[in-house]
UniProtKB/Swiss-Prot annotation:
Subcellular location: Plastid membrane
Protein function: One of the components of the core complex of photosystem II (PSII). PSII is a light-driven water:plastoquinone oxidoreductase that uses light energy to abstract electrons from H(2)O, generating O(2) and a proton gradient subsequently used for ATP formation. It consists of a core antenna complex that captures photons, and an electron transfer chain that converts photonic excitation into a charge separation.
Keywords: Membrane, Photosynthesis, Photosystem II, Plastid, Reaction center, Transmembrane, Transmembrane helix
Stored PANTHER family: PHOTOSYSTEM II REACTION CENTER PROTEIN J (PTHR34812:SF3)
Subunit structure: PSII is composed of 1 copy each of membrane proteins PsbA, PsbB, PsbC, PsbD, PsbE, PsbF, PsbH, PsbI, PsbJ, PsbK, PsbL, PsbM, PsbT, PsbX, PsbY, PsbZ, Psb30/Ycf12, at least 3 peripheral proteins of the oxygen-evolving complex and a large number of cofactors. It forms dimeric complexes.
Membrane topology: Single-pass membrane protein
Cited InterPro entries: PSII_PsbJ, PSII_PsbJ_sf
GO CC, any one term: thylakoid membrane
Protein name: Photosystem II reaction center protein J
Similarity comment text for this entry: Belongs to the PsbJ family.
Encoding gene per record: psbJ
Example GO biological process: photosynthesis
Main subcellular location: plastid
TM ranges: 10-30
Length: 40
């Protein structure tokens, strides 16, 4: 096991970023669909 405390693998950054983007888009469309997005 190599020490990776000071360096984050790119695949972890890509995975987390992808999940956050998909989550934000999902919340946005869900809010618009339920009518809550109109107040934003």
């Amino acid at each position: 096991m190599t020490d990776t405390t000071g360096r984050i693998p790119l695949w972890i950054i890509g995975t987390v970023t992808g999940i956050l983007v998909i989550g934000l888009i999902g919340i946005f469309f869900f809010g618009s669909y339920s009518g809550l997005g109109s107040s934003l």
